[in-house]
C-alpha cells in the first residue's frame, strides 16, 4: 500500500514536471499536493486548475518553504505562462511579498498588543489612585465633622454655664428675701406681744 502511494506520487510528479518543464524539482511536491486536491479531473488540466482562486495561495507557502528565491521566481514564471497558455491568465505576487506582508502583519499585531497593554496599565493605575484618594477624602470629611461637633458641644456647655450661675444667684436672692421677710414678721409679732402685755398690766 505504501509502495503504491509512493508510486502514485512519483507518477503525478512526473506528469507535473512534463507539463511544467521549467518548474524546479523542489516545487514538484507542492504542485502535486495542490493540483490533486482542487477538484479538477487531472493534474494536467490547467484550464481547470487556473480557474481556482486558491491555486496561488495553496502553492505559494509550500514553494517558499521548499525552494530558494531563484527557484521561487522560476515557479512563478512557469505558473503564469502555463495558465496563460490554457486561456486563464493569473497574477502571482512578487517573490518575497508574502513573507514581507506576514512580517508586517506580525509587527502591527505586536504593536497593537503593546498599546492595549499600556492603556490597560494606565487605566488600572488611575483607578487605584482614585480609590486611594476617596478614603482619604472621607477621613478628612469625618475629621472635620467630628471637630465641628466637638466645637458645638463646647459652645453649648459654655453658654449654659452662665444660665446656671444666674439661676443659682436668683435662688440665693429669693432665699435671702424670704429670710428677711420672716425676720421682719417675727419682730412685728414680738412688738405686738409686748404691747399686749403692757395693756394687760395697765
Curated annotation (Swiss-Prot):
Residues 19-108 form the CFEM domain. Residues 181-202 form a propeptide. Residues 1-18 form the signal peptide. A lipid is attached at residue 180 (GPI-anchor amidated asparagine). InterPro entries: CFEM_domain, Extracellular_membr_CFEM_dom. Disulfide bonds join 26-67, 30-62, 40-48, 50-83. It is found in: Secreted, Cell wall; Cell membrane. The GPI-anchor is attached to the protein in the endoplasmic reticulum and serves to target the protein to the cell surface. There, the glucosamine-inositol phospholipid moiety is cleaved off and the GPI-modified mannoprotein is covalently attached via its lipidless GPI glycan remnant to the 1,6-beta-glucan of the outer cell wall layer. Transmembrane segments: none annotated. Heme binds at residue 45. SMART domains: CFEM (SM00747). Pfam families: CFEM. Disruption phenotype: Increases susceptibility towards the chitin/beta-glucan-microfibril destabilizing compounds Congo red and calcofluor white. Keywords: Cell membrane, Cell wall, Disulfide bond, Glycoprotein, GPI-anchor, Heme, Iron, Lipoprotein, Membrane, Metal-binding, Secreted, Signal. It is a lipid-anchor; GPI-anchor. Belongs to the RBT5 family. The CFEM domain is involved in heme-binding and contains 8 cysteines and is found in proteins from several pathogenic fungi, including both human and plant pathogens. The CFEM domain adopts a novel helical-basket fold that consists of six alpha-helices, and is uniquely stabilized by four disulfide bonds formed by its 8 signature cysteines. GPI-anchored cell wall protein involved in stabilizing the cell wall. Not implicated in virulence, heme uptake and biofilm formation. This is GPI-anchored hemophore cfmB. It comes from Aspergillus fumigatus (strain ATCC MYA-4609 / CBS 101355 / FGSC A1100 / Af293) (Neosartorya fumigata). The gene is cfmB.
Amino acid at each position: 500500500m505504501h509502495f503504491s502511494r509512493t508510486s502514485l506520487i512519483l507518477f503525478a510528479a512526473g506528469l507535473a514536471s512534463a507539463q511544467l518543464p521549467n518548474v524546479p524539482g523542489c516545487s514538484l511536491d507542492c504542485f502535486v499536493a495542490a493540483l490533486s486536491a482542487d477538484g479538477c479531473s487531472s493534474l494536467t488540466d490547467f484550464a481547470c486548475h487556473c480557474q481556482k482562486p486558491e491555486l496561488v495561495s495553496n502553492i505559494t507557502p509550500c514553494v517558499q518553504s521548499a525552494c530558494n528565491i531563484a527557484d521561487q521566481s522560476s515557479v512563478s514564471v512557469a505558473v503564469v505562462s502555463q495558465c496563460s497558455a490554457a486561456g486563464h491568465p493569473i497574477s502571482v505576487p512578487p517573490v518575497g511579498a508574502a513573507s514581507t506582508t506576514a512580517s508586517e502583519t506580525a509587527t502591527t499585531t505586536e504593536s497593537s498588543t503593546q498599546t492595549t497593554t499600556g492603556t490597560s496599565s494606565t487605566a488600572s493605575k488611575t483607578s487605584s489612585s482614585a480609590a486611594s484618594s476617596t478614603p482619604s477624602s472621607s477621613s478628612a470629611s469625618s475629621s472635620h465633622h467630628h471637630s465641628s461637633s466637638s466645637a458645638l458641644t463646647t459652645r453649648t456647655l459654655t453658654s449654659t454655664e452662665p444660665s446656671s450661675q444666674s439661676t443659682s444667684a436668683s435662688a440665693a436672692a429669693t432665699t435671702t428675701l424670704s429670710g428677711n421677710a420672716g425676720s421682719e414678721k417675727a419682730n412685728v409679732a414680738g412688738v405686738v406681744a409686748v404691747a399686749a402685755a403692757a395693756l394687760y398690766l395697765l
